[in-house]
């Protein structure tokens, strides 16, 4: 059994594609009657989600209901857009971990993050000091501040770290830093 959260940083009017592998976790959660949720990386974004449970008695009725749950969930996730330019990926990642903990039923917990990792706001707002610091040092400092959620027992998958959309370009040095930083943050508290 699996429960999951999808975190996306898609902004208003931006088109993006959610990786198929990312959608396998919410599909499994919905089919198993577990929690599936999503949120955007806006500052103070509210998680959306629920535990999906069928109400029909027949196998055919349950399958139809699950298909409807899947369609509704995927439409919501693919349509989710950040409402402000205040993207804070770390805050959203922490919120997702806390949301899964609040719905913990003993199943495997998975967070799928679809983001470049760039955050113009929050504790990881891109500054030259941050981008030049060691990922482990950043993780240790944030953990000592209590700025990281408990990721123990939570599997986190990142999609698109260091990749820009449209005509934006992220320099290789920054892309490499982002690709190492976020997994290190998760590992710092047991993920």
Q: What does each model-identified segment do?
A:
Residues 6-14, 56, 73-87, 165-176:
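Second-shell loop/turn segments in exported
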Residues 19-23, 90-97, 139-142, 179, ...:
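Extracytoplasmic/secreted envelope proteins and their assembly/folding machinery
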Residues 24-31, 75, 95-105, 119, ...:
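Sec-exported extracytoplasmic/periplasmic mature domains
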Residues 118-179:
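VWA/integrin I-like adhesion module and closely mimicked acidic/polar interface patches used
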């Amino acid at each position: 059994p699996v429960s999951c959260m999808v975190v996306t940083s898609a902004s208003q009017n931006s088109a993006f594609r959610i990786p198929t592998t990312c959608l396998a976790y919410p599909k499994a959660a919905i089919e198993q009657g577990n929690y599936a949720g999503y949120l955007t990386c806006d500052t103070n974004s509210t998680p959306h989600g629920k535990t999906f449970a069928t109400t029909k008695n027949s196998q055919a009725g349950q399958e139809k209901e699950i298909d409807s749950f899947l369609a509704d969930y995927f439409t919501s996730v693919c349509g989710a857009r950040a409402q402000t330019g205040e993207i804070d990926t770390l805050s959203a990642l922490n919120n997702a971990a806390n949301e899964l903990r609040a719905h913990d039923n003993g199943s495997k917990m998975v967070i799928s993050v679809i983001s470049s990792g760039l955050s113009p706001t929050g504790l990881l707002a891109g500054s030259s000091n941050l981008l030049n610091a060691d990922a482990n040092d950043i993780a240790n400092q944030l953990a000592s501040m209590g700025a990281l959620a408990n990721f123990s027992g939570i599997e986190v998958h990142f999609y698109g770290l260091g990749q820009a959309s449209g005509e934006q370009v992220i320099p290789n040095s920054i892309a490499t830093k982002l690709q190492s930083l976020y997994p290190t943050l998760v590992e710092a508290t047991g993920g």
